[in-house]
Amino acid sequence: FRHCPFNDLRVVFLGYDPYPNLVNGKPVATGLAFANHKETIEERYSPSLRVIKDSISHYLSWDKGINFDPSLEKWEKQGVLMLNSALSCSRGITGSHSLMWRPFTRSLLENLSSFKTGLVYVLLGSAAQSFEQYIRQDFNFIIKCRHPAYYARTHTIMPNIWKEINDILISQNGYGIEWFNQFKT
């Protein structure tokens, strides 16, 4: 919430819960859904983040020389809120705090979708899609897709939600999200 002010908000990604594991004694979770730490090298991206990057690369035909920020902070600065339906979990136990966070997430989505219209909500996976009923659909847009972990398990490419998001944003305010920062020199 800190780097994505309410007035600048354009897209809300909703995932499941933070990564429950540690790598080299450091939590993988960063506070942004699907993000990895900035210093994470590509070979060590979490499976979900790798699927997201590969999907964007596939559909945008940028298969080399791209500059992808694994922290996803560049997206956040463009008005993309990377949110999980649960904001914590016990180490090593996926979904362990999901019931505890459900009322908070429900209230957040109800209020957000009522007071900030024209947002694109991207619901990734069945846990996120269970919150669809709390989003005002008369003034907002909803895109649903399987969770990136599914595509990691099946070794398949996510659908082109990136173009769909940008098409909506461009029709609303003339510009989309820059998913990749720029070409490396």
Task: Describe the role of every protein-language-model region.
Residues 1-135, 141-144, 150-153, 159-168, ...:
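A polyanion-binding, active-site-adjacent surface
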